[in-house]
Amino acid sequence: MSLPGLDLTQPSADNQFAPAPPTQVSLSKGSEWRFEVAFGTVIRVKLLAGTAELFGTELAPSQTYTFSGTKGAIYTWHGCTLEVGAGDTGPSVDGLAPGGLSGATPRGLGAGGCQSEYTAEETPMVEYANVHFALETMRQEAKATGKDGPRVLILGPENAGKTSVAKILTAYATKVERQPIVVNLDPTEGMLSVPGTLTATAFRTMMDVEEGWGSSPMSGPSAVPVKLPLVYFYPMQNPLEAEGSVYRPIVSRLALSVMGRMAEDEEARETGIIVDTPGALSQGKPGSLEMINHIVTEFSITTILVIGSERLYSLMMKNYDNKPTSSASAVASDERITVVKLSKSGGCVDRDAAFMKGVRESQIRTYFFGNPIPSTASAALSLSASSTTNVTLSPHAQQLDFNTLSIYNYTIASLEEDEDEYDPSQLGAGDSFLPGGGNDAEASQAQQDEPARATPLPGIVSSIESATPPVASNVPLKKVLPPAPSTLANSLIAITNAPTTASAAEVRDASIMGFLYVAEVDSEKGKIRALAPVGGRVPPRAIVWGKKWPGEVVGLVG
């Protein structure tokens, strides 16, 4: 386009941001290539020569992998050559901006458009590999003696690389045909689920290089076998909210399910579990040490890995090192806890609030719409000749009558909320939050006396039926009564496996069937427009509102 009065041509946006040609990155033995890619920017990485891995999962040679909104590191044990190039801008999905809900981000100046990228010679990968070999020795001993395998707890502050270590240990275990159960106790970001969930998954097959942990069951082809997570909903960011009165029983319920799986699955029992924790537990806040002790006890932890905190390591050594575990067989087998300090990788970077917001929005978008970014690696690995290079899902929108839904909301007051969010009348020990009200005190007492049954992982029936977790007298769950609140719009609601007549404690402790996204609320007509991952009627189950966390998600649908 010519500018008035000047014989000049304004460069078009396509020419101004034309991608640079691919760049080759050569890595020497024992080094890694660290990179950061913004949301809305796509880079393509291909392994040309040698061997390399991303968080323990090997890259296939001559296959192109795509990354967007990622901070990662590709490591090589023997040296390799990578080709890094720019990909197309992430496509929009039903009005979603290419860069996620926050909008597109300008392409970086690094190779392929990375915001930052460099080669590092000093890495802690040898330490992490040694941990894997030590765990493998314990697994071999467990198989020979009939004991349980190692139960590993990973602790450390925010942005210390805890999840990366969990991925590495999981990937190395699956390489030697082990089946670890991985537990995510961090509600700030989901594992095979949306943010605000605590999950447990048995990993039998390889992990996905591009998707991180992989993907849960979906309608469509998948190059990597899907994983089957057991999901619990904790719609709060901090596990210490209300002094941990909500987080603690959910952790107990999840631990009961995991132990039930190990009791029924010989491979899982021999391999053990890997528990990833939120950084909030390592900040020394009141109640954090008590919560760590609760996790150590419930999961019968045998190995505690501490990353990036000398103070926390000292406390863990004092409280747990060489102490007996809480396992039932600890006395007979003299099973004791080992505390190990690991170095924090220099590649760990701070993830600001804007980036974490993009991560949450991306996980929620992927849950409903799939991953629209093309991947030639996924197409090459797929067994279907007609499969596409991306997984695009088509969620189902429907109108729901608010009066027919049993929606609950946590009424925990925090400093960030308005005073009108807090209703002391809902926190009593009475039956005011039972669906429909009522005065069945005898039924409530009978429920407390009834043994709790652990919800097993998919495909496994738990044999543990007599364990009874502590029953809280005050469960801060309140049923949301008509008219439908306008703040329900643009938020997630979780459909539990609890019936609509369940008590507040049963709703809190129930596993999750799936999630709905509330796109619109019509308070006058008593209708809500919701987005579901599958079509059909919404099952008659108790529903929990994720008002506090992951909070409002604007612009998911037009």
UniProtKB/Swiss-Prot annotation:
User: What InterPro entries does UniProt report for this protein, alphabetically?
Assistant: Clp1, Clp1/Grc3, Clp1_C, Clp1_C_sf, Clp1_N, Clp1_N_sf, CLP1_P, P-loop_NTPase
Q: Name one Pfam family in it.
A: CLP1_N
Q: Where is this protein chiefly located? A: nucleus
Q: Name one GO biological process term.
A: mRNA 3'-end processing
A Gene Ontology MF term for this entry? ATP binding
Q: What keywords are assigned to this protein?
A: ATP-binding, mRNA processing, Nucleotide-binding, Nucleus
The places in or outside the cell where this protein is found are: Nucleus
Q: Where does this protein hold ATP?
A: E32, K71, N159, A160, G161, K162, T163, S164
Task: Give me the Gene Ontology terms describing cellular component.
Answer: mRNA cleavage factor complex
Signal peptide, first to last residue: none
The region called Disordered is annotated at 1-25, 418-455
The entry's family comment says:
Belongs to the Clp1 family. Clp1 subfamily.
**Complex and partners:** Component of a pre-mRNA cleavage factor complex. Interacts directly with PCF11.
Describe the function of this protein.
Required for endonucleolytic cleavage during polyadenylation-dependent pre-mRNA 3'-end formation.
Protein name per UniProt: mRNA cleavage and polyadenylation factor clp1
Taxonomic source organism: Aspergillus oryzae (strain ATCC 42149 / RIB 40) (Yellow koji mold)
Q: Which gene encodes it?
A: clp1
